[in-house]
Swiss-Prot record:
<dbReference type="InterPro" id="IPR004114">
    <property type="entry name" value="THUMP_dom"/>
</dbReference>
<dbReference type="GO" id="GO:0070043">
    <property type="term" value="F:rRNA (guanine-N7-)-methyltransferase activity"/>
</dbReference>
<dbReference type="InterPro" id="IPR054170">
    <property type="entry name" value="RlmL_1st"/>
</dbReference>
<dbReference type="GO" id="GO:0052915">
    <property type="term" value="F:23S rRNA (guanine(2445)-N(2))-methyltransferase activity"/>
</dbReference>
<keyword id="KW-0489">Methyltransferase</keyword>
<comment type="function">
    <text>Specifically methylates the guanine in position 2445 (m2G2445) and the guanine in position 2069 (m7G2069) of 23S rRNA.</text>
</comment>
<protein>
    <recommendedName>
        <fullName>Ribosomal RNA large subunit methyltransferase K/L</fullName>
        <ecNumber>2.1.1.173</ecNumber>
        <ecNumber>2.1.1.264</ecNumber>
    </recommendedName>
</protein>
<dbReference type="InterPro" id="IPR019614">
    <property type="entry name" value="SAM-dep_methyl-trfase"/>
</dbReference>
<dbReference type="Pfam" id="PF10672">
    <property type="entry name" value="Methyltrans_SAM"/>
</dbReference>
<keyword id="KW-0963">Cytoplasm</keyword>
<dbReference type="InterPro" id="IPR002052">
    <property type="entry name" value="DNA_methylase_N6_adenine_CS"/>
</dbReference>
<dbReference type="InterPro" id="IPR000241">
    <property type="entry name" value="RlmKL-like_Mtase"/>
</dbReference>
<dbReference type="Pfam" id="PF02926">
    <property type="entry name" value="THUMP"/>
</dbReference>
<dbReference type="Pfam" id="PF22020">
    <property type="entry name" value="RlmL_1st"/>
</dbReference>
<dbReference type="GO" id="GO:0003723">
    <property type="term" value="F:RNA binding"/>
</dbReference>
<keyword id="KW-0949">S-adenosyl-L-methionine</keyword>
<dbReference type="GO" id="GO:0008990">
    <property type="term" value="F:rRNA (guanine-N2-)-methyltransferase activity"/>
</dbReference>
Length: 711
């Protein structure tokens, strides 16, 4: 069975690792959460033990939902008397996006109406609503016309541990605090005899969470006590009681062995009083020393090694002070130089102000605030002088830098909402700087940023010296804005090689970077060839096909590196078939499938000419993707011209559609003209090009065209 664990953005990979450690058979990170495979007991264990999850959602039903009537009908089909006992209360949380229903509260109300009406039709007592502490809390996820109704097994946000009685201004949520501690390596440091220090501890969230983590206390134990998280009738009470009994035994042993190596201080006496009160309620007051102290007055710790965790002030209510950050960095280097630090800063500029050299940097979200988590190990490694006497950008380079920053700000909300990690940030926005810049963020390891720069061929009338100068200015601007070294910038040119060669090889680094899109890990090669293995412009279309492929058969023609196949597989396609003439691309596709745990007989790879294969094939498919090249010539197949062959190709592809199936056809030939009359003889055809262009490609929306065909 599959269920979903939600979390704050930036915690997905940590949460996936945690859930696997808790016993889930599979956990795949996606936007703001993790798709998990496991039994109900695994989900209930996550409710009790997850330090990172926001909610654990157990699905009851999933259905197409184009409008409010479909939402009501889909919910009303469930036998709600089997889920909600007579006299029990109900509440619904709703999240909607990309759908005709735009108001979450209205969607929640329609679900309540459907549940109540269904129960009343059974002749049973009408359930009442309790938004604060319901017996059954439901969750609606309505995204792009697909609705999922789930039980919130934890009964609400899991960051509420049950110990917070007092707080200072803008407290840190407990699950985000757990992420800061885990990125700092606190569990290992404690096991090795290290200490824990927070010199700006506020109401004590980081230190209390650290103490409970060290004592092996289940996060949900105090929250629920002897109660159960949900009175959903499907909740396994016996299993829950077994989990709680085991957790209490571990709690007893861990608290008894808890060492007094945790220290916190803050300049605000009111915050320290709140921290002491919270620690008392959490049962860890004896293990934590709290005191009123300025950052600069921090004293040397007796432990030779340990971890510093800190969440300095930075949001709209708590003004960020760069001087305070600098004092923090100077003090840590003086007092605990060999310790490890994990600092949650408001942004990269504030992190930089500490003067510390970050070995790793992560993007996290504290509510709606985008933060930079820097990890320094050890603290005392001097940061490289950040261009102490920096070479100022030229006027032209500064123009490019300003445009890049403007575009980043423009795309910020869209990227955060959709979880976009690879995107086009610049595409000849300034005509004299004629290039495209794509950003690729590494999905694993240090989450490094790579830039892929494609220089467009300049007109012959422009002097070569000007072309080189402008390219240098563009590269300098990009490196400064994204803070990347030259070795992480891949430069390509679309000029043809000597002798009219096709896609020439640029470097021979053989460096593979794993990136993520639509919940799938993908291998890209940014340096060695013109193309990287991932066509970013098809991102929306791939997402649509992945959603529609769940439980269905997916065919990918001219599959290239198989990205669409992989995303369909990750989304739950019952089978995928990927066809391409290139053995190199098919191996790349196989590697991508294996990277996502999707290798196996149900994912078929076929090395063949796609058109010839189609005309000989007899199997049927529910979703077909056909993205042919404009031209192709090969010693192993007939020459291919998309304008000449598209009717024949589409006829053969439509013939392979199962009843109710859909074919998505796309190509990049800018002068392409669909023979609508010929195609109408065997298919219904609708151009959907505008719907397949994301904001980062709106500047040049004709980068591809796309159609939806049905038999």
């Amino acid at each position: 069975m599959k269920f979903f664990a939600s979390c704050a953005k930036g915690l997905e990979y940590l949460l996936a690792d945690e859930l696997l450690a808790l016993g889930a058979s599979k956990a795949t990170a996606t936007i703001s959460g993790v798709n998990v495979e496991g039994a109900l007991r695994d989900a209930q264990r996550a409710v009790l033990w997850s330090r990172l999850a926001s909610r654990v959602l157990w699905p009851l039903t999933e259905f197409d939902c184009p409008d409010e009537d479909a939402l009501y009908a889909g919910v009303a089909e469930l036998p709600w008397h089997e889920h909600l006992s007579t006299g029990h209360t109900l509440s619904v949380d709703a999240h909607v996006s990309g759908t005709a229903i735009t108001h979450a509260r209205y969607a929640a109300q329609r679900i309540k109406d459907a549940v109540v009406d269904t129960i009343r039709r059974q002749g049973l007592e009408r359930p009442s609503v309790d938004v604060e502490s319901p017996d059954l809390r439901l969750n609606l996820s309505l995204r792009k016309g697909r609705a999922t109704i789930s039980v919130d097994l934890g009964g609400g946000p899991l960051h509420r541990r049950g110990w917070r009685m007092a707080q200072n201004e803008a407290p840190l949520k407990e699950n985000l605090a757990a992420a800061v501690l885990l990125r700092a390596g606190w569990p290992r440091a404690y096991a090795d005899g290290g200490g824990l220090l927070d010199p700006m501890c506020g109401s004590g969230t980081l230190l209390i969470e650290g103490a409970l983590m060290a004592a092996d206390v289940a996060p949900g134990l105090q929250r629920y006590g002897s109660d159960i998280p949900s009175r959903w009738r499907g909740f396994d009470r016996d299993s829950w009681q077994q989990l709680v009994t085991e957790a209490r035994e571990r709690d007893s042993v861990g608290r008894a062995a808890l060492k007094q190596v945790i220290h916190g201080s803050d300049m605000d006496p009111h915050a320290i009083r709140a921290a002491k009160e919270n620690a008392q309620v959490a049962g860890v007051a004896e293990a934590i020393w709290f005191g009123v102290r300025e950052v600069g007055d921090l004293q040397t710790r007796p432990q030779a090694t340990g971890v510093v965790v800190c969440n300095p002030p930075y949001d709209e209510r708590l003004a960020a002070d760069a001087a305070l950050y600098r004092k923090l960095g100077d003090t840590l280097q003086r007092v605990v130089p060999q310790w490890r630090a994990s600092l949650l800063c408001g942004n990269a500029e504030l992190a930089y102000a500490t003067g510390l050299r970050a070995g790793k940097k992560y993007q996290l979200f504290n509510g709606a605030i985008e933060c930079a988590l820097i990890v320094c190990d050890p603290i005392a490694v001097p940061r490289r002088t950040p261009l102490a006497a920096p070479t100022a950008l030229s006027e032209g380079a500064q123009m490019v830098a300003n445009r890049l920053r403007k575009n980043l700000q423009k795309f910020k909300k869209w990227r955060a909402r959709e979880g976009i990690e690879c995107f086009r940030v610049y595409d000849a926005d300034l005509p004299e700087y004629s290039a495209a810049i794509d950003v690729y963020q590494q999905a694993d390891g240090d989450r490094r940023i790579f830039l892929h720069v494609q220089e467009y061929a300049a007109p012959a009338t422009i002097p070569e010296a000007d072309v080189r100068r402008r390219l240098g200015e563009l590269l300098a601007a990009a490196r400064e804005v994204f803070e990347v070294p030259a070795e992480r910038v891949a430069l390509k040119s679309r000029e043809r090689g000597k002798g009219g060669s096709k896609y020439g090889r640029f470097e021979q680094r053989n460096e593979i970077v794993n990136v993520r899109e639509h919940g799938a890990l993908l291998r890209v090669n940014l340096f060695d060839y013109l193309d990287t293995g991932l066509f970013l412009d098809h991102r929306p279309l791939r997402g649509t096909m992945a959603q529609q492929s769940k439980g269905r058969r997916f065919l990918n023609l001219f599959c290239y590196t198989g990205v669409a196949s992989v995303q369909a597989a990750v989304a739950g396609a019952s089978a995928t078939t990927s066809v391409d003439l290139s053995g190199t691309y098919l191996q790349w596709c196989a590697d991508n499938l294996a990277l996502n745990g999707q290798a196996g007989s149900k994912h078929k790879l076929v090395q063949a000419d796609a058109l010839a294969w189609l005309e000989a094939e007899r199997a049927h498919f529910d979703v077909i993707f056909c993205d042919p090249p404009t031209f192709s010539n090969s010693a192993r197949a007939e020459d291919f011209d998309i304008q000449r062959e598209h009717v024949r190709l589409l006829r053969a592809a439509v013939a392979r559609l199962a009843p109710g199936g859909v074919l998505y056809f796309s190509n990049n030939f800018r002068r392409f003209k669909l023979d609508e009359e010929a195609v109408s003889e065997f298919a219904q055809c609708e151009e959907i090009s505008p719907r397949t262009i994301d904001p980062d490609f709106e500047r040049h929306a004709r980068i591809h065209r796309a159609w939806r065909l049905t038999a």
